[in-house]
């Protein structure tokens, strides 16, 4: 069976260090599908076309360049496909968004009410496939770093911006999307607490927090694994405003946050009896600018680059440092 993943509204990047590519590649691996990066007419030959909305999609469409002829042509290609499945999101929102743009200077003139009616008829029957619907051997649950710390055989229950503090307050057992907690479970929390919160408060008992983390995790599964927090990059690295908290990209100096990171890893390792998923130790001790250059996503980002994900053995052949 021929399976393909694509996005008619925006190209799926080809750059190896792209967060968006990493997200699409994980879906491709899980589904045993290929990626059509530019939504070519070749997708008509696939038995199933999966629509990837992008790692940062939250339910609303951002078409900064308008609905140009390329997007119009790509969507017309969808009309010729055998079967279409939308990944994670209800695709029917496209129609209302397009109707609002009819007649705009940035909208292709063939995007009309009649064309939108045809599109609506197509989209209303497209099913949604979510991570929790997959048949996989394990689950990685946590913040946006779950992409980097998930195993090849895992579903990913990702909650961007999630903190360990917030997860414990909610209850780890309540983070599994009302599905059975089965298989190998990896929890991925703590990086955002270190980046933004722990140094703001002088009364945080880190050991007590981690003990509660492990306690709640063991209430979910007998043998949980815990992702280490990510290394702390150099302070001058530019970050997107979406990663800011109270107007800043982090709180505390690089050296202070590294100290907290080292303490977190040490306590987590001891209290979990070594059940920790961690990149190579030298990442944490090397020059933070070289770490960012070699192992993080290209440009402004807080994430590990896809070639260095856990599923890729954390880059078993790392770049020259």
Feature-to-residue mapping (PLM):
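Charged phosphate-binding loop/patch that engages nucleotide di/tri-phosphates or the phosphate backbone
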Residues: 118-132, 305-320
């Amino acid at each position: 069976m021929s399976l393909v993943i694509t996005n008619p509204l925006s190209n799926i990047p080809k750059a190896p260090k792209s967060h968006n590519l990493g997200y699409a590649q994980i879906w491709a691996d899980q589904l045993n599908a290929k990626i059509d990066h530019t939504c070519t007419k070749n997708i008509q030959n696939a038995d199933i076309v999966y629509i990837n909305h992008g790692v940062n999609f939250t339910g609303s469409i951002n078409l900064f360049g308008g609905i140009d002829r390329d997007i119009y042509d790509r969507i017309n290609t969808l009309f010729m496909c055998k079967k279409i499945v939308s990944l994670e999101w209800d695709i029917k929102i496209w129609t209302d968004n397009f109707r609002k743009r009819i007649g705009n200077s940035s909208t292709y003139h063939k995007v009309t009410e009649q064309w939108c009616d045809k599109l609506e008829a197509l989209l209303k029957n497209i099913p949604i496939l979510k991570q929790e619907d997959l048949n996989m051997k394990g689950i990685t649950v946590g913040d946006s770093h779950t992409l980097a710390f998930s195993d090849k055989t895992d579903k990913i229950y990702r909650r961007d911006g999630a903190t360990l503090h917030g997860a414990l307050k909610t209850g780890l057992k309540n983070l599994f999307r009302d599905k059975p907690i089965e298989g190998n479970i990896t929890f991925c929390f703590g990086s955002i607490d270190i980046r933004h919160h722990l140094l703001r408060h002088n009364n945080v008992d880190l050991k007590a927090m981690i003990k509660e983390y492990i306690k709640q995790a063991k209430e979910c599964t007998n043998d949980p694994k815990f992702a280490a927090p990510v290394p702390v990059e150099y302070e001058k690295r530019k970050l997107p405003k979406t990663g800011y908290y109270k107007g800043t990209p982090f709180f505390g100096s690089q050296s202070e946050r590294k100290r907290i990171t080292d303490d977190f890893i040490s306590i987590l390792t001891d209290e979990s009896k070594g059940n920790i998923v961690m990149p190579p130790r030298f990442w944490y001790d090397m020059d933070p600018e070289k770490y960012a250059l070699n192992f993080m996503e290209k440009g402004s980002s807080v994430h590990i680059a896809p070639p260095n994900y856990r599923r890729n053995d954390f880059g078993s052949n790392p770049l020259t440092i």
